[in-house]
Amino acid sequence: MHWDLNNYYSNNMDGLISKLKLSKTESTKLKELRQIVRERTRDVFKEARAVAADVKKHTLTLEGVRLKLGQTNVRYLSTADQAEVARLIFEMDDDARNDFINLQPRFWTQGSFQYDTLNKPFQPGQEMDIDDGTYMPMTVFESEPRIGHTLLLLLVDTSLKSLEAENDGWRFEEKNTCGRIKIPHEKTHIDVPMYAIPKNQFQTKQTAADSAHILKSESIFESVALNRDSREAYLVESDKVNLALREGAKRWSISDPKIVEDWFNDSCKRIGGHVRSICRFMKAWRDAQWDVGGPSSISLMTAVVNILNREEHNDSDLAGTMKLVAKLLPDEFNRGLESPDDTDTKLLFPAEWDQNVHQKTIVETMKTLYEILVDAENANTREDALHKMNEAFGKRVTNAQLITSIAAAPAFHVSPSREPEPRKINKTMVSG
């Protein structure tokens, strides 16, 4: 028997896609959690700005700054970090202090939640990941933001550590490129990378967006209701977006996550909306095979785009497209998966001759996916076909009736894109 697996993938009630996509309630809950973090970050900076304004009026000594900060959310930092925040605010030069007093954090969600490829967790311990960048429009002086790197990071950490202290089970973790707040009972963590962007450039773009009636809230960065076309109003030059780093001598790294978003959206427009579904399915396969440590989401997304960008395929045949991707995926990785970011020479995944044992195991596991999909198509019964599919994607789908006997029909194929290769993205962002 030859089985049609398209409904297994695409059925909105019982198919794989229905087990991966967040419900409206679940999506709203994630936005509410994100908003809690944003509001706390605003509050923390408002408190710190007020203290800086008092210093400007010459009404506070260093000890006075320390005592006043002890009455704010900064009290959730360690004693040493509280003292450091006090010192940094007290010792600011006048220009930096004026910048700081007028500083208003902005927020911009990035990663899979923004790309619409965020899947529900499958195995215990797996979590949904929201990457919500905090952007600081400020004066950039001699290629570095004027306001101190350490102060900004400590204030972002203050917001997360205060939430950790006030919410049972929440846990703060420090990462090189972000602060993370883990919310285990929601199977979620929120990563908060911090960026500095030029104030003058941001204000120019903000004014332009206002005139086009695009801004529906305090800033386009903060709107969760705008569609993707509206988000084009964010046009701060990519080489002016500075990501704060916590480790090593380098404090800032040029990194604009919107380049990743634009690259993926452009790829979906050029190749077809099915790219998002294929990326979801590949991430579902990854999550079923590894609880942690499988191929990264950005590497899977890049490989899928590379394959579908050049290979003829039927965009209405998800089963056939998945089989095509699964067949070519190991070679795509073994060649050395280049980042679409031409400014970064580091590969997303090393070539075969440079792979360590774990990376070789990843590729070997990839090879089994194609075999499983072929075996499922040729299984004796639909129940056997479902069992094979669940080997690949986990026991998410339970309705074997979604799998039907195949009917021969002419197929309309999508030719490979004749457009230029997808434009390069900045790989320094970590995507989930």
From Swiss-Prot:
Its cofactor is Mg(2+). The gene is dncV. Belongs to the CD-NTase family. A02 subfamily. It catalyses: GTP + ATP = 3',3'-cGAMP + 2 diphosphate. There is a cross-link at residue 432 (Glycyl cysteine dithioester (Gly-Cys) (interchain with C-493 in Cap2)). There is a cross-link at residue 432 (Glycyl cysteine dithioester (Gly-Cys) (interchain with C-13 in Cap2)). Mg(2+) binds at residues 129, 131, 191. Changing residue 432 to A: Reduced conjugation to cellular proteins, increased thioester bond in Cap2, no change in phage protection, slight decrease in cGAMP production in vivo during T4 infection. There is a cross-link at residue 432 (Glycyl cysteine dithioester (Gly-Cys) (interchain with C-513 in Cap2)). It comes from the Bacteria. There is a cross-link at residue 432 (Glycyl lysine isopeptide (Gly-Lys) (interchain with K-? in acceptor proteins)). One of its GO terms (biological process) is nucleotide metabolic process. It is an enzyme of class 2 (transferase). This is Cyclic GMP-AMP synthase. GTP binds at residues 110-115, 283, 297, 344. In bacteria expressing capV-dncV-cap2-cap3, this protein is conjugated to about 130 cellular proteins by Cap2, most of which are involved in metabolism; more conjugated protein is found in the absence of Cap3. Most conjugation occurs via an isopeptide bond with the epsilon-amine of Lys on the target protein, but Cys-conjugation also occurs, including to Cap2. Conjugation or deconjugation from cellular proteins does not change the DncV activity in vitro, but does so in vivo during infection. (Microbial infection) During phage T4 infection is conjugated to at least 2 T4 proteins (fibritin (wac) and dexA.2). Keywords: Antiviral defense, ATP-binding, GTP-binding, Isopeptide bond, Magnesium, Metal-binding, Nucleotide metabolism, Nucleotide-binding, Nucleotidyltransferase, Thioester bond, Transferase. One of its GO terms (molecular function) is GTP binding. Disulfide bonds: none annotated. Its EC number is 2.7.7.-. Induction: Part of a CBASS operon consisting of capV-dncV-cap2-cap3. Coiled coil: none annotated. Binds 1 Mg(2+) ion per subunit. A Cap2 dimer is bound on either side by a DncV monomer.
